[in-house]
């Protein structure tokens, strides 16, 4: 859990912004969203595999685009 110390004479908005930023860096909101509903282990693995395939395809397309530009 991210903790921030409110500085002296610091506006509430600034402290809230710092807290939100620290929560985002810690990945708390995405973790809460992923744990909101139960997901079967097979579904988790399937989604992870699909994202890995998508990342790989994106990487290959970037490499191919770089090769095409060289000619």
From Swiss-Prot:
<dbReference type="InterPro" id="IPR018278">
    <property type="entry name" value="Ribosomal_bS21_CS"/>
</dbReference>
<dbReference type="GO" id="GO:0003735">
    <property type="term" value="F:structural constituent of ribosome"/>
</dbReference>
<keyword id="KW-0689">Ribosomal protein</keyword>
<feature type="compositionally biased region" description="Basic residues">
    <location>
        <begin position="48"/>
        <end position="59"/>
    </location>
</feature>
<feature type="compositionally biased region" description="Basic and acidic residues">
    <location>
        <begin position="60"/>
        <end position="71"/>
    </location>
</feature>
<protein>
    <recommendedName>
        <fullName>Small ribosomal subunit protein bS21</fullName>
    </recommendedName>
</protein>
<dbReference type="InterPro" id="IPR038380">
    <property type="entry name" value="Ribosomal_bS21_sf"/>
</dbReference>
<dbReference type="Pfam" id="PF01165">
    <property type="entry name" value="Ribosomal_S21"/>
</dbReference>
<dbReference type="GO" id="GO:1990904">
    <property type="term" value="C:ribonucleoprotein complex"/>
</dbReference>
<dbReference type="GO" id="GO:0006412">
    <property type="term" value="P:translation"/>
</dbReference>
<dbReference type="InterPro" id="IPR001911">
    <property type="entry name" value="Ribosomal_bS21"/>
</dbReference>
<feature type="region of interest" description="Disordered">
    <location>
        <begin position="48"/>
        <end position="71"/>
    </location>
</feature>
<comment type="similarity">
    <text>Belongs to the bacterial ribosomal protein bS21 family.</text>
</comment>
<keyword id="KW-0687">Ribonucleoprotein</keyword>
<dbReference type="GO" id="GO:0005840">
    <property type="term" value="C:ribosome"/>
</dbReference>
């Amino acid at each position: 859990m991210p903790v921030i110390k409110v500085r002296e004479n610091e506006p509430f908005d600034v402290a809230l912004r710092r807290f939100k930023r620290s929560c985002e860096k810690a990945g708390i909101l995405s973790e809460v969203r992923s744990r909101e509903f139960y997901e079967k282990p097979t579904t988790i693995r399937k989604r992870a595999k699909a994202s890995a395939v998508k990342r790989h395809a994106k990487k290959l397309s970037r490499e191919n685009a770089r090769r095409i530009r060289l000619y």
